[in-house]
Amino acid sequence: MYKILKMEGRAKRAHMETVHGNIETPVFMNVGTAAAIKGAVSTEDLQQIGTQVELSNTYHLHVRPGDEVVKKMGGLHKFMVWDKPILTDSGGFQVFSLAGLRKIKEEGVYFHSHVDGRKIFMGPEESMQIQSNLASTSRWLSTSAVECGRAPLCAELCRPHGEMAAAMQK
């Protein structure tokens, strides 16, 4: 359930209920790219500072340790020893951050792993399957093959990727 508690202009304060706990927005999400928060922060530390939700990265977890490994271990919550909400992204940011290691096609993105050089294909279905294996609380599909660009962006660069993302949502 998602309930807007207050609005002011375009800003919203909301309450979201998930199977792994509630989230009050706006919220700061700790980023555990590879299912761990950097800097020797323990689960107890995160609980103590009031962390409501953690964000992990679909692409990086697919590459290492592997989404099948996480699935065999019972999903991200057991793998991380974290009982609160976990959001996984689509892997789309890597289209930007690993620009030298990828090729965008209509059906998705072809990557060369930054770890071992193997070829990895990630389209909408693959992204959702990986996220299903990870068993996160909430899964994003919206950026599967969208190229993030640096400002200022030109319409000629952005339009084709926006159209591709819209087509993938159908």
What would you call each of these model-derived segments?
Residues 1-169:
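Non-catalytic, usually N-terminal nucleic-acid engagement modules in DNA/RNA processing proteins
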